[in-house]
Amino acid sequence: MGSFELVFYRSLFGAIFIAFVVAGSGGTLKTEHFRHHIVRSLLGVTSVALWFYALSQMHFGTCMTLIYTTPLFMALNFIILAKCKGERAPWAVVVAIVTGFIGICLVMKPGLGTDEFIPALICLGVALIDLAAYWQMKQMGRLNEPSYRIVFYFCVLGMVFAAVGTVATTGFHVPNLTGIAGLLGMGLFATLGQICTTRSYAYGNMLLSSCLGFSAVPFSVIFGVTLFDESVDPLSLFGMTLILIAGMSAAVATKRMEAKQEAAELASKKTS
């Protein structure tokens, strides 16, 4: 299957899953912010399709390492925004993000082949697209759009865009039972992960969310060891330790920053 077709089936099963859950819980999928959903879906589908393509063209570790540059771009984004506003940049969280990325490199051990330059650029493009998508999620969170609704429209519109891309490229294939099971699992777990990610970026601290996103790599290693009898070298263990330290440091630093902001706001109210 081509990358667009994989996105189509992932989106299809995701939309069906959310529709059933919302119907059973008495929620609603009606929205007043359809334009924002279109923008978010375009960014998301483009990102996933390019990621699937790049993954098929280059070394897995290198591809994933480049994808995880999104938190670095986000940290740079926050530094620039802080400078423009005349505020202090969140350096403690930025340092934690850089530390986490070093851990990612130690675990993934990226290496760029001579024929992987273009796929590498595509991966960096995906990282930037993801950054734009996260900002779009934050905007929709400010509009009080629930995370399940954001993901539902991402799946529905993604299904449409992916169907067009599939017809224009490889065409559709009929999967066998094993393929259906794999696609169903991919759609279900991707949707659950997407809902959690959307909620964290839409309603939480974006820098902290991006740093904690590094934890997916240690979990992947743990699954590889427990389910597929993979081995872990000392360098990877050290990298996983750095990722753990980075996540905890970012959480503590964010909590302190939020406490200072609350204290400053309280003091401002008392003096006014």
Which residue ranges define each predicted feature?
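C-terminal transmembrane-helix exit sites in multi-pass transporters
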Residues: 70-94, 218-237
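Transmembrane alpha-helical segments that form core, pore/gating elements
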Residues: 1, 18, 111-170, 265-272
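Cytoplasmic-side transmembrane-helix entry/capping segments in multi-pass membrane proteins
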Residues: 32-43, 87-100, 119-124, 144-156, ...
